[in-house]
Amino acid sequence: MKIQDYTKEMVDEKSFIDMAHTLLEEKGTTMNLYDIIDEFKALGHYEDDEHLENRIVQFYTDLNTDGRFLNVGENNWGLRDWYSVDDIEEKIAPTIQKFDILDEDDEEDKNLKLLGEEEEEIDDQETAEADAEDDDEDLDDPQDEEEINDSDIVIEEDKDEMDEAEQLFEEEEDFNDDPDDDKI
């Protein structure tokens, strides 16, 4: 039976993974995961609901674990039967960056740049330039005085508060005096 002939009830009863197998067999070509899901939504007359979301999550899990399917890159899925073993290894093999092994002569080479060294050198240069600018700055710069005056920072000493603090201190000393001292 073709997938287009499925009724809503049949779509509800059949698993998405089996429907995906049928769909891919009919199409005969790889399909994007989202296109497969859109096809299922149209067949089942689904609207966005929690039941559909749960089925999609289960479908994606099954798609990754079911040995009949193969991810051929960029979220495109096909049937494993379509590919030879060599093709499968080529499509799913991770890409490995090859690096040359350094020998003692290479390590001593001043012109050789190792990975990440350029970034460190740029950071070091920027730091050195910033330090040089700070060293060149005049400490008696009138512009600094203007900036301080314009910053609206006001520091005032409140003499009343100081007097109250002193009074509290003196009162505490009176409490700490030994009563026997007054009798002497």
Curated annotation (Swiss-Prot):
Name of the molecule in the record: Probable DNA-directed RNA polymerase subunit delta
Job of this protein: Participates in both the initiation and recycling phases of transcription. In the presence of the delta subunit, RNAP displays an increased specificity of transcription, a decreased affinity for nucleic acids, and an increased efficiency of RNA synthesis because of enhanced recycling.
GO-annotated cellular components: DNA-directed RNA polymerase complex
Keyword Transcription: yes
Residue ranges of domain HTH HARE-type in the record: 14-82
GO BP term, example: regulation of DNA-templated transcription
Keyword Transferase carried by entry: yes
Chain intervals with Acidic residues compositional bias: 117-184
Pfam families cross-referenced by the UniProt entry: HARE-HTH (PF05066)
GO function term, MF aspect, one: DNA-directed RNA polymerase activity
Region named Disordered: 114-184
UniProt similarity note: Belongs to the RpoE family.
Subunit structure: RNAP is composed of a core of 2 alpha, a beta and a beta' subunits. The core is associated with a delta subunit and one of several sigma factors.
Species per Swiss-Prot/TrEMBL record: Staphylococcus carnosus (strain TM300)
UniProt keyword list: DNA-directed RNA polymerase, Nucleotidyltransferase, Transcription, Transferase
